[in-house]
């Protein structure tokens, strides 16, 4: 199973926020996921990023590939990924 760390869109029309989830790469954007590891709210000023550092590192260590956007969010949150 190819696993990705990606954003799942939530919220109302024109007022989105995103959950950072671990999901099978074949499932739809807002479909089934394995685990929720944080959230991102771009509407607040400044943007809110909350990630569970242990879960992020665990999933990356197990082979999950973060999307480009999630990579940037991980860097902004100050989580070191090795």
From Swiss-Prot:
Source species: Clostridium botulinum (strain Langeland / NCTC 10281 / Type F)
GO cellular component annotations of the record: cytoplasm; small ribosomal subunit
GO-annotated molecular function: structural constituent of ribosome
Protein family according to the UniProt entry: Belongs to the bacterial ribosomal protein bS16 family.
Gene Ontology biological process terms, A to Z: translation
Membrane spanning residue stretches: none
Keywords: Ribonucleoprotein, Ribosomal protein
UniProt cross-references to Pfam families, sorted A to Z: Ribosomal_S16
InterPro entries: Ribosomal_bS16 (IPR000307), Ribosomal_bS16_CS (IPR020592), Ribosomal_bS16_dom_sf (IPR023803)
HAMAP family the record matches: Ribosomal_bS16
The protein, known as: Small ribosomal subunit protein bS16
């Amino acid at each position: 199973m190819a696993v990705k760390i990606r954003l799942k869109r939530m919220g109302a029309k024109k007022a989105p926020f995103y959950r950072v989830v671990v999901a099978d790469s074949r499932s739809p954007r807002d479909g089934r996921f394995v685990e929720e590891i944080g959230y991102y709210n771009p509407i607040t000023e400044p943007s809110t990023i909350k990630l569970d550092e242990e879960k992020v590192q665990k999933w990356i260590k197990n082979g999950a590939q973060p999307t480009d956007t999630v990579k940037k969010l991980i860097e902004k949150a100050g989580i070191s990924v090795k």
